C-alpha cells in the first residue's frame, strides 16, 4: 500500500504504514484468544476501505468499523472495537500516550483544566470551578480510566455521540471518566461535602453500579441543568391546553426529556365546535404539530428529547391513530418522530376473546370514560353502548373487537407502533393511583 498517503491531524502527509496498524490492533486485542487471527482479519478487511488522501480520523473510524462488522461472528471483536474507539477518544481529548500509567496521569492533569475552561466558556455551571465547593485536584486523582474497560463498544460510542460534552464546533472535550465525574459533581452541589459526595457518586458510576438517566447524563453540571427524564402531559379538549402542550413539549424536548402525552380527551374529527360554529379536525393534526415541534428541537449531535402520544382504542379516530406511523399516505397525517401507544382495557380483551363487537365513541359525548378503569370502566362502557343503541349518542361506530385487535397487531408488526399499554393492569397496581387514572 505504498501509494496510499495519510493526512495527519496537523495537515502533514505520510505514507500508509501497515506495521503501525498491526501494532495498534495487537494492543487492542491483548489478552484475547485468537489474537493473531483477529488482527490479520481486521488488517485484511481494512485494505478494502483505504484510499489515497485518507485522513487520520477517517482511518481510525475505518479501523473501528471493520472490527464492529465482525462482532456478529465473534464477541471478542466488540472488545477490540471498544478499545480502538477509546484510544481515538483519548488521543482527541488528552493527546498521545504510550502506556496506562501515562494515560492516568493525563486524566489527572487535564481534568482541572477542562473543568475551569468549560466553566469559563459557559459550557458548565460556574459552580463546577468554584474552589469553595470542589477540590478539583482531589477529584482528578480519583479518576480511574481502567474502568473504561467495563463498557462494551455500544456503551462507549453512545457516551461519545450523545452524552460527552462538546464545544459548539463539535470538538469533544470529555473522555468517558470526565463525563462520569462531571455528572457526579453536578449531582453534588447541595451536599454537605460536595467533593466527597462527588467521588462517591463517581465510583458507583465508574463501576457500572449506577447509571443515571439520559437527561441527567447530558445536563448534569451544565449550564442548563434539567435533570428529570420523564414527563406526562394530558391534553385537554380546548385550544389553550393544546397550544400549551405543544409549547411544553418543545421546552421538555430541549432538555432531552421523554414525554408521555395523552391525546384521548380531544374530540373526534367532525365533532361540532360551538365557539366557531365549525367542525373539529380531530386529534391527528395536533399530533402532527407535536411531531414537528419534536423535530425542530431535536438537538443535533446530542441525545434528543422523545415523546409518545397515547390514545384509548375506543376513540372514534383510533383507526387514523393506527396509521400515524405508516410510511405511505398523507404526510400531514403521519408522524416521524412522535411515537404512538394504545391504552387497552380488560373489557376490550374480553370482547376479543368472546368474538363480540367493540364500540368507538367521540370523547365529547363520553368524557368520563377516560378517567375510569377496571370494573368501573366496563360498567360505564356498557351503559354507553345501550345509549348508542337507543340512538341517545350521536356519533359512534361498531367494529368487531377481533378485527380491531388484528389491525393493532398488524400495525405493530409493520411499524413497531403502537406500543401496547394495559390500562387496567397498570392502574390496579399503581402505588400512586390517588393522582388519577
Regions found by a protein language model. Give the residues of each.
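Extended catalytic cores of very large enzyme megasubunits
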Residues: 1-437
Amino acid at each position: 500500500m505504498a501509494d496510499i498517503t495519510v493526512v495527519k491531524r496537523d495537515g502533514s502527509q505520510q505514507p500508509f504504514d501497515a506495521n503501525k496498524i498491526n501494532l495498534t490492533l495487537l494492543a487492542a486485542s491483548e489478552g484475547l484468544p485468537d489474537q493473531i487471527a483477529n488482527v490479520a482479519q481486521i488488517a485484511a478487511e481494512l485494505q478494502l476501505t483505504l484510499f489515497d488522501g485518507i485522513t487520520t480520523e477517517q482511518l481510525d473510524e475505518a479501523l473501528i468499523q471493520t472490527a464492529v462488522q465482525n462482532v456478529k461472528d465473534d464477541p471478542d471483536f466488540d472488545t477490540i472495537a471498544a478499545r480502538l474507539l477509546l484510544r481515538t477518544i483519548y488521543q482527541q481529548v488528552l493527546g498521545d500516550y504510550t502506556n496506562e500509567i501515562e494515560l492516568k496521569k493525563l486524566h489527572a492533569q487535564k481534568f482541572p483544566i477542562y473543568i475551569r475552561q468549560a466553566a469559563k466558556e459557559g459550557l458548565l455551571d460556574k459552580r463546577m470551578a468554584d474552589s469553595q465547593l470542589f477540590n478539583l485536584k482531589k477529584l482528578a486523582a480519583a479518576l480511574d480510566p481502567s474502568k473504561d474497560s467495563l463498557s462494551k463498544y455500544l456503551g462507549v460510542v453512545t457516551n461519545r455521540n450523545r452524552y460527552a460534552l462538546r464545544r459548539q464546533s463539535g470538538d469533544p472535550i470529555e473522555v468517558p471518566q470526565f463525563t462520569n465525574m462531571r455528572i457526579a459533581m453536578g449531582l453534588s452541589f447541595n451536599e454537605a461535602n460536595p467533593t466527597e459526595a462527588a467521588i462517591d457518586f463517581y465510583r458507583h458510576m465508574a463501576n457500572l453500579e449506577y447509571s443515571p438517566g439520559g437527561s441527567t447524563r447530558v445536563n448534569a453540571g451544565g449550564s442548563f441543568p434539567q435533570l428529570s427524564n420523564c414527563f406526562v402531559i394530558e391534553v385537554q379538549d380546548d385550544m389553550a391546553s393544546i397550544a400549551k402542550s405543544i409549547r411544553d413539549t418543545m421546552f421538555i424536548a430541549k432538555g432531552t426529556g421523554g414525554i408521555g402525552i395523552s391525546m384521548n380527551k380531544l374530540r373526534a374529527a367532525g365533532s361540532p365546535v360551538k365557539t366557531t360554529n365549525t367542525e373539529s379536525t380531530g386529534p391527528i393534526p395536533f399530533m402532527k404539530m407535536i411531531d414537528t415541534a419534536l423535530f425542530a428541537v431535536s438537538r443535533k449531535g446530542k441525545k434528543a428529547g422523545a415523546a409518545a402520544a397515547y390514545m384509548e382504542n375506543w376513540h372514534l379516530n383510533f383507526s387514523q391513530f393506527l396509521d400515524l406511523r405508516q410510511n405511505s399516505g398523507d404526510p400531514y397525517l403521519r408522524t416521524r418522530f412522535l411515537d404512538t401507544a394504545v391504552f387497552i382495557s380488560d373489557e376490550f380483551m374480553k370482547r376479543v376473546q368472546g368474538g363480540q363487537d367493540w364500540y368507538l365513541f367521540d370523547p365529547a359525548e363520553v368524557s368520563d370514560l377516560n378517567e375510569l378503569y377496571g370494573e368501573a370502566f366496563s360498567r360505564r362502557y356498557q351503559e354507553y353502548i345501550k345509549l348508542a343503541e337507543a340512538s341517545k349518542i350521536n356519533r359512534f361506530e361498531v367494529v368487531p373487537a377481533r378485527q380491531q385487535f388484528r389491525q393493532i397487531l398488524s400495525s405493530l408488526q409493520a411499524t413497531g407502533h403502537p406500543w401496547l399499554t394495559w390500562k387496567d393492569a397498570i392502574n390496579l397496581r399503581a402505588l400512586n393511583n390517588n393522582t388519577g387514572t
